[in-house]
Amino acid sequence: MSKNILVAVAWPYASGSRHLGHIGGAYLPADIFARYHRVIGNDVLMVSGSDVHGTPITVRADAEGVKPIDIVNKYHKEFLGYWDKLSISWDNYTTTMTETHIEVVHDIFNELLNKGLIDKQKSLQAYDASENKFLPDRYVEGTCPYCSYAEARGDQCDSCSKTLDPEELINPVSKISGNLAEFKETEHFFLKLSMVESELSKWLETKKGWRPHVINWAKSFVKDGLQDRAITRDLDWGIKIPVDDLGPGKKIYVWFEAVIGYLSASKEWAQINNKPDEWENWWLNPEAETFYFIGKDNVPFHAVIWPSILLGYENLNLPTNVPANQYILVKGEKASASRGVGKTLDEYLDEWNPDALRYALASALPEQSDSEISESEMIRRNNEELVAAWGNLVQRVFSQIKNNFDKLDEMSDLTNEDESLLNDFENAFEVIGNMIEKVELKSSLQEAMKYVSKVNSYLNETEPWKVIKEDEKRASRILYTSLTAIDACANLLYPYMPTTSELVRDAIPKETEKLWGVNKIKTGVKLNEIGLLFKKFD
């Protein structure tokens, strides 16, 4: 029986080009997971979009002397190009400035307000006296009070991932003027997290199979006591507050409305497909499963704050899992577009086959700890594992068949050696599938590549290029077995490398069309043409 699987993926700020850390942190893992669930027959809804209200956008707009919408339009278009080139299979990739999103944000705000989970409170907010304006949290930088990182932002420290308020920073400085920030009293709406603390704590205790760094952090955060958090700010750029109690110059704070985007994107998908109630299959159906693919800096918002909002709103599904990745490091530093650490994604896509890039990243996913990635290691994997092992295997078998047989004859009389190889593959799909379902994506790819090695070993041991000189029938059996195994390898590798896997699958005529399993190869017909799958780097 098929299941409804919601794959919710972090919303990138439309403020700058992406890098490998973003792709390996959230978007590639989500796509691997979604593609697997589709091929086994589950109903997948994969959603995200460009976050257009984050303060990094206004910071960039100020620096370039343009309007925030100009920055948004530029980078949203750029992101769409990335997803197309990398074959990221969105069901809906949208933005946080659609009418649907604003309506859903207002609905949740009003519902929580009516339930007493939102109230007005006075607080101190960073202020730049020389500019005569309040400063959004990301306009403030200083030293982290927890780890002493010198470039911590007013909302979070990139080094230790602690969420912060600007007044906690040591020597907080305005990014606009460079002057020390002052703090002035202002009034805002706050989300009363304390009201759902007990219920949230009980829910977290039910979560099994989460990555240790996610569940341990979430439990620790709640154990320390949840503090009410401001959900509005003194801003010009953002979603309007649906009530007028605070006066002008106030907007909904991005961290509150961005996570609501998963729900609004699902509703928008249903509207686009003329099935306005279809979103309920993933949000109201108690049997549905929801997975949030994010980086570790987003754990507070997805493992604590978003579940708190959902608990307060009531009746919507809570996360099944939040498989947050840690950081991809470049020469010991977190990859960062804003700080220029690591190449941009455009630079890699100009040089790499997108599937090869997906493979290199998937081989180094930072699932349990920060993961160093170097271009030399990526090139080694491409040359040794894709070109020499997988791509060469396909070419060897295809060329042997084309050079020696007009077509493969009907198969029978397979040896124990042949049947043993094919039986190994029958087990592989269950083992690797279980690993993917646990979001163990790096190890499941390693396991899949072991089967490429098995086929190469089988081919080297059986030597059909020699056997054909004395026993053409036996050589045909060997190549039939190898071709069956290659088709199975393409199925195993499809979630990771969809484009090249489809090229292989489409070139092999089959009597069955299993997308996740071993197929019966059609005999008596010619193979379709297939070119080189990957290029070697010098």
Regions found by a protein language model. Give the residues of each.
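N-terminal, positively charged nucleic-acid-binding surface of large information/translation enzymes
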Residues: 1-203
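Structured secondary-structure scaffolds
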Residues: 2-48, 100-104, 170-403, 444-448
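A non-catalytic, amphipathic alpha-helix used as a structural packing/dimerization or gating element
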Residues: 32, 70, 74-81, 107, ...
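N-terminal alpha-helical segment
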Residues: 53, 341, 424-429, 485
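Alpha-helical scaffold segments in carbohydrate-active enzymes
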Residues: 104-111, 258-261, 389-400, 431, ...
